[in-house]
């Protein structure tokens, strides 16, 4: 059963759940907390690799990822990131989230943005128990027009679901946690699998 707005506020007040900066009460509604777009992005460089063999040797996968991913792009206040039709880009939430071992989070895009063709997360919308850090967004523009995305705009909503008990292996204690404490638009680390 997901937490309602009153329970989300209580978990925040008690320090069991942390969202930094803490969202104002106007952004905690029903069963979600609205989150904003941060100022860090990453794109894919066009045609710098014929393909990426995801099951290939780790060093080859790593080299291919280095060739296709841009350096992190950091926008200043007032600047826009333009996502063109058919493009995939990574971005990050403005807020950092810390979940306890007995709570899982879910990120959903905003319906108003989806109706313009913007997918906020391509597939990965679960936030593991024990997560700590900003949330990387996997943007895809399936619409017909470029979309201007500006830091600070409302981009998605988080919901939270208590587990039957604390996870034995929460994300922050796993040795193989590839994205622990991420603060930027971290590229795929599939080569670390």
Swiss-Prot record:
Disulfide bonds: none annotated. Residues 169-193 are annotated as: Disordered. Coiled coil: none annotated. DCTP binds at residues 110-115, 128, 136-138, 171, 178, 182. It is an enzyme of class 3 (hydrolase). The active site is at 138 (proton donor/acceptor). It holds the Pfam family DCD. CDD domains: trimeric_dUTPase (cd07557). Belongs to the dCTP deaminase family. Homotrimer. Catalyzes the deamination of dCTP to dUTP. This is dCTP deaminase. It comes from Cronobacter sakazakii (strain ATCC BAA-894). The gene is dcd.
């Amino acid at each position: 059963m997901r937490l309602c707005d009153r329970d989300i506020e209580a978990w925040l007040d008690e320090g069991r759940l942390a969202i930094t900066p803490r969202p104002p009460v106007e952004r905690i509604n029903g069963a979600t907390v609205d989150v904003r777009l941060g100022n860090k992005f990453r794109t894919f460089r066009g045609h710098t690799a014929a393909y990426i063999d995801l099951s290939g040797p780790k060093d080859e996968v790593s080299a291919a990822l280095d060739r296709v991913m841009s350096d992190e792009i950091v926008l200043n206040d007032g600047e826009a990131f333009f996502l063109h039709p058919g493009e995939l880009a990574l971005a990050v939430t403005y807020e950092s989230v810390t979940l306890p071992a007995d709570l899982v989070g879910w990120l959903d895009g905003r319906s108003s943005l989806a109706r313009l063709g913007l997918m906020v997360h391509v597939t990965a919308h679960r936030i593991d128990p024990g997560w700590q850090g900003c949330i990387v967004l996997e943007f895809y523009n399936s619409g017909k027009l470029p979309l201007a995305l500006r830091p600070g705009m409302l981009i998605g909503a988080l919901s939270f679901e208590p587990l039957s008990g604390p996870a034995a292996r929460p994300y922050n204690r796993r040795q193989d946690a590839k994205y622990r404490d991420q603060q930027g638009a971290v590229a795929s680390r599939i080569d670390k699998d």
